[in-house]
């Protein structure tokens, strides 16, 4: 084995295949860009982002871990969200949940 060498499985790897997913249209009504990371509780994002926050409760962006989506001022785009797994507890972020979903 060589340090850093990868041994990927054959076939396609599907991320979040078993989790509930939705698509939402999101608009940045602010005057500055807003960037949202892969595991941020989407319902608690910057208030300049306009979308159905109740629909986004308990969900995060359906993108690879460690990546982010950037919303430029005035930009509208559709994003896919995926539900949190595990104990479905949310702490921190903007402090709106602080416990079970």
UniProtKB/Swiss-Prot annotation:
EC top class named in words: hydrolase
Keyword check for Cytoplasm: yes
Entry's Gene Ontology molecular function annotations: urease activity
One BP annotation, GO: urea catabolic process
Coiled coil regions in record: none
UniProt family annotation: Belongs to the urease beta subunit family.
Protein name: Urease subunit beta
Organism classification: Bacteria, Pseudomonadati, Pseudomonadota, Alphaproteobacteria, Rhodobacterales
């Amino acid at each position: 084995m060589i340090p850093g060498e990868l041994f990927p499985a054959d076939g396609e790897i599907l991320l979040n295949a078993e989790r509930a997913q939705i698509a939402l249209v999101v608009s940045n009504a602010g005057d500055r860009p807003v960037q949202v990371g892969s595991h941020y509780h989407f319902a608690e994002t910057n208030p300049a982002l306009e979308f159905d926050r109740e629909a986004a409760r308990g969900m995060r962006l359906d993108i690879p871990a460690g990546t982010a989506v950037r919303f430029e001022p005035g930009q509208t785009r559709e994003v896919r969200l995926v539900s949190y797994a595990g104990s479905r507890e949310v702490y921190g972020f903007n402090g709106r949940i602080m416990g079970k979903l």
